[in-house]
Amino acid sequence: MNFKYIVAVSFLIASAYARSEENEIQSLSQRDVLEEESLREIRGIGTKILGGVKTALKGALKELASTYVNGKRTAEEHEVMKRLETVMRDLDSLDYPEEASERETRGFNQEEIANLFTKKEKRILGPVLGLVSNALGGLLKNIG
């Protein structure tokens, strides 16, 4: 009789432990899904903001380029124009990320790809802002 109780209690303990393990695994997977969704939302918001900034920068750069094209250029202005054209190509390359799709097919995970884009955006946006400020400063100096 005692043996039946021992077996029944041990069976209940084992099933309760298995249920708790299963619940823990489900909660971890739910947490992972929620984290992934929140990362996607954050990246989506960042992408929209970056898209707006890129559009504004492209407009400003095109305006600067047309200003330089319409007048005579010195060697320094010609160099600035070449840099602006390079920056425009780099900004366009952000719209067509072939690099990321190649890396993704090689087995990189999404977080590494996002880090690559962030590094590329920082690498491009830093010089862009510097060039725009230098070009605007030069224009203001020439006007004034």
UniProtKB/Swiss-Prot annotation:
Family from the record: Belongs to the bombinin family.
Main location: secreted
Lineage: superkingdom: Eukaryota
InterPro entries registered for this protein in UniProt: Bombinin
Full protein name: Maximins 2/H8 type 2
Subcellular location as annotated: Secreted
Sites bearing Asparagine amide, chain numbering: N70
Cleavable signal peptide: 1-18
One example of a Gene Ontology biological process annotation: defense response to fungus
Keywords, comma-separated and alphabetical: Amidation, Amphibian defense peptide, Antibiotic, Antimicrobial, Cleavage on pair of basic residues, Cytolysis, Fungicide, Hemolysis, Secreted, Signal
Propiece span(s): 19-43, 74-123
Keyword rRNA processing among record annotations: no
UniProt modified residues of type Isoleucine amide: I143
Pfam families from the UniProt entry: Bombinin
Keyword Ribosomal protein: no
Tissue localization of expression: Expressed by the skin glands.
Summary of the function given for this chain in its UniProt record: Maximin-2 shows antibacterial activity against both Gram-positive and Gram-negative bacteria. It also shows antimicrobial activity against the fungus C.albicans, but not against A.flavus nor P.uticale. It has little hemolytic activity.
GO cellular component, one term: extracellular region
